[in-house]
């Protein structure tokens, strides 16, 4: 048998893929049908690519969880290491559960005002159907489940900020009780005001990846807890002297900082939400570069300021300087030029050094500098948006900053106070002297060093 390879589109085509006894004849679709198939295939490929990108970025943000754990474990004393590691792994699990059943619905209820909708599904429904995605003509460009995954690791990040600030004197179960409310209610409601399409989204407030929504929110909750807890024993003298309490493991703290720096590419890069065209791909690349440059600027600035202020370089200030730069650029890592990103990060690095010193002077004890890094620099980051983003307004940034801070601080203070009244939030003086590992956990991270 011979075949004429010069068939017209209208001619039948012999399908050779079937068994010999069941050869079938198919008709090649006309040009209009072929174009429709190509368009639908392009939509599906873009959807798959953007979903995969979103999931990978979320996985990078999840990797920030061990970053926080290592940083905090390095900056606390050896006798409190296992306890702070337990807090970090437990808070991540609690955040995932609470955000699944309550928080995600509160944050993305579709309400346009200050109060979110209360129509809770207590879980995730079905994901996007193929027909619906194709019919959207590209407006639905990633899986709903990928959005949940990306958002839930942000919630855990906000809670991780609190862990370091209240370290070395808080009761484990009091902290975990607060984590339930913070991740299920406090964080999602303020997040609904902007990312969820609520009141702040119409007031000119801009926060690309969460300098305020994530970082300042976590710092405000931490500040409320620190004020109720009080300082660690021996931190401040009667005459106002500040007694340094060095961390046990600087290599671990340094590793934690680098893990956070690495994970931040997902934190900021994923917030572009899309990758599957040239413009979006260029935007993600720009976000990566600006994020990196801000961290570098923050670290160098903090290192220089510490040298000028204290006479010696300070590793912990350098580590916090890098994180300060990252927090500072998070509100808008897309609009600035790379050089401006260095400057924004550098200002954050300067601020964090003076902020840590200032908090010590007023006896607000923050063992890892979390309130300074995420709170002070989070506020700076929100206003730094005005340097390069013409769509943001000063009043919008001011209103957003005040709304997020006041809501989080006041609600957190109430919740911390209730927990304090019910089960207490601070370990005893004897337990603090012995260490949280022995008092709360029963397993010491460095038994050969913490005991004789």
Task: Name these PLM-found stretches.
Residues 23, 34-452:
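Hydrophobic alpha-helical transmembrane bundles of multi-pass membrane proteins
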């Amino acid at each position: 048998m011979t075949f004429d390879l010069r068939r017209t589109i209208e001619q039948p085509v012999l399908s050779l893929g079937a068994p010999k006894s069941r050869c079938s004849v198919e008709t090649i679709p006309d040009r209009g049908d072929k174009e429709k198939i190509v368009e639908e295939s392009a939509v599906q490929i873009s959807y798959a690519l953007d979903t995969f990108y979103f999931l990978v970025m979320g996985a990078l943000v999840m990797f920030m969880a061990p970053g926080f754990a290592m940083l905090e474990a390095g900056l606390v004393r050896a006798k409190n290491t296992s306890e702070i590691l337990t807090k970090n792994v437990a808070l991540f699990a609690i955040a995932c559960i609470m955000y699944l059943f309550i928080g995600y619905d509160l944050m993305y209820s579709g309400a346009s005002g200050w109060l979110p909708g209360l129509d809770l599904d207590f879980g995730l429904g079905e994901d996007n159907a193929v027909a619906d995605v194709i019919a959207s003509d590209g407006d639905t460009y990633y899986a709903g489940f990928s959005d949940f995954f990306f958002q839930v690791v942000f919630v855990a990040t906000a809670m991780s900020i609190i862990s370091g600030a209240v370290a070395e004197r808080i009761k484990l179960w009091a902290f975990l009780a607060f984590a339930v409310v913070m991740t299920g209610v406090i964080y999602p409601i303020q997040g609904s005001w902007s990312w969820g399409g609520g009141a702040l989204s119409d007031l000119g407030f801009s926060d690309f990846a969460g300098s305020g929504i994530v970082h300042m929110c976590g710092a405000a909750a931490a500040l409320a807890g620190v004020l109720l807890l009080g300082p660690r024993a021996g931190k401040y003298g009667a005459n106002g002297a500040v007694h340094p309490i060095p961390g046990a493991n600087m290599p671990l703290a340094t590793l934690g900082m680098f893990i956070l720096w690495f994970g931040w590419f997902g934190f900021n890069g994923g917030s572009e939400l899309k990758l599957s065209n040239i413009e979006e791909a260029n935007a993600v690349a720009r976000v990566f570069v600006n994020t990196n440059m801000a961290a570098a600027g923050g670290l160098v600035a903090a290192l220089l300021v510490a040298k000028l202020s204290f006479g010696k370089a300070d590793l912990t200030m350098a580590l916090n300087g890098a994180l300060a730069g990252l927090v500072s650029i998070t509100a808008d890592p897309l609009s600035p030029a790379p050089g401006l990103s260095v400057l924004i990060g550098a200002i954050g690095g300067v601020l964090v050094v003076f902020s840590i010193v200032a908090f010590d002077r007023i006896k607000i004890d923050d063992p890892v500098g979390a309130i300074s890094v995420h709170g002070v620099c989070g506020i700076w980051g929100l206003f730094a948006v005005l340097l390069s983003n013409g769509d943001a307004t000063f009043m919008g940034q001011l209103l957003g900053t005040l709304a997020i801070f006041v809501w989080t601080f006041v609600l957190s203070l109430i919740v911390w106070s209730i927990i304090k009244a019910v089960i207490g939030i601070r370990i005893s003086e004897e337990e603090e002297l012995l260490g949280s590992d022995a008092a709360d956990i029963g397993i010491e991270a460095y038994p050969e060093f913490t005991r004789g």
